[in-house]
Amino acid sequence: MRPGTFKRFLVAGVLTCLIVAGTADAKSRKKKTATPKDSTFAYYLLTLSYAPDFCSEPQGVKDPRECGAGRHIGFVVHGLWPQGENARGPENCGHASPVSQSIIQQTLKYIPTESLIQHEWSTHGTCSNLSANDYFATVRKARDSVSIPKDLDQPPQKLQLSPAEVEAKLAAANPSFPAAAFRTSCYQDGELQEVRICLNPDLSPRACTASAGECKLSKVMLLPVR
């Protein structure tokens, strides 16, 4: 064999090996990307956003469906989040097909916008081990299981309460819940962002853990409904 011919064979062999290895690596990466994340969780965090305070924030001003004048909305469902016992729960656990219009129409009474419904399904619902239909049925059932005192949900004037006072009012309105089932979250300006209720996967109430979060301010403000 001529020297030049052997060199060409050697180069061709090396290139073939590189192509095969690259193809196998690409297939491996593609397979790993398609594998859903671990969706195990300890409990649900039912998050209820306080609309008047959300609507006073820059992001809320841009949302007329929730924040338009005359809407008279108090607490609305932000989401039902799978939660870890000692850490945040899983998110974005798999491919999220668009939520059907029939599910959206059943859920708009609870979650005020279609875009938020789609977002909650993609980010949190895919980690619930439920179909979209069953997940949003669970969202509605969870919300219906919780009573919000009228002086919190529809205050006629601005309220200032400590996080503990907000949680105590919720506990009093839901005597079958442990007092530790409630948490508050707040904006940096001191307005109430949301209340969080801890529920087992079967929706029975339970005590929250530190992973549920807690407002660290001494007082939170609730604006009157509009």
Kindly give the residue locations of the regions a language model identified.
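Hydrophobic helical h-region of N-terminal Sec-dependent signal peptides
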Residues: 6, 10-20
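Aromatic-lined ligand-binding clefts that engage carbohydrates, nucleic acids, or primary amines
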Residues: 30-55, 62-66, 108
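Sterically constrained small-residue positions within well-ordered secondary structures
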Residues: 17, 37, 186-188
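Domain-level detector of nuclease and nuclease-like folds
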Residues: 47, 59-226
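Boundary at the C-terminal end of the N-terminal hydrophobic targeting segment
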Residues: 24-28
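Hydrophobic alpha-helical segments
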Residues: 21-22, 36, 61, 93
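N-terminal secretory signal peptides that target proteins for export/translocation
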Residues: 1-5
